[in-house]
Curated annotation (Swiss-Prot):
Pfam families per record: CEP15-like
Localisation per UniProt entry: Cell projection, Cilium
PANTHER family on file: CENTROSOMAL PROTEIN 15 KDA, GENE, 49355-RELATED
GO cellular component: cilium
UniProt protein name: Centrosomal protein 15
Entry keyword set: Cell projection
Principal cellular location given in the protein's record: other
Known role: May play a role in ciliary assembly.
Amino acid sequence: MTSLFAQEIRLSKRHEEIVSQRLMLLQQMENKLGDQHTEKASQLQTVETAFKRNLSLLKDIEAAEKSLQTRIHPLPRPEVVSLETRYWASVEEYIPKWEQFLLGRAPYPFAVENQNEAENTIQNEAQR
């Protein structure tokens, strides 16, 4: 009976050791999990800060690019814009005539007298 009692005491102590070790391991796991959450939150904050910084840098680069573009290619003068507008209007006006000529359905779209008119118009525009 004493051997059973001694064995019971030994098993009880072993049980207490296992339970205390289990509690210690659970506490370590909780601490580790808390540290991981803290680290993850810190990483998330770092990522958000980097994203905002990158977005700001991108906006600055785009603004600098736009500024350089306007320096390299300034807006054309009003006379140039006017000439360009009239040129494209003329192109659109004569496209149907040229289209028929190129398809072989009509003669050459400009006669000699039309060429003289065009030259006179160009000279008049140049004198303005």
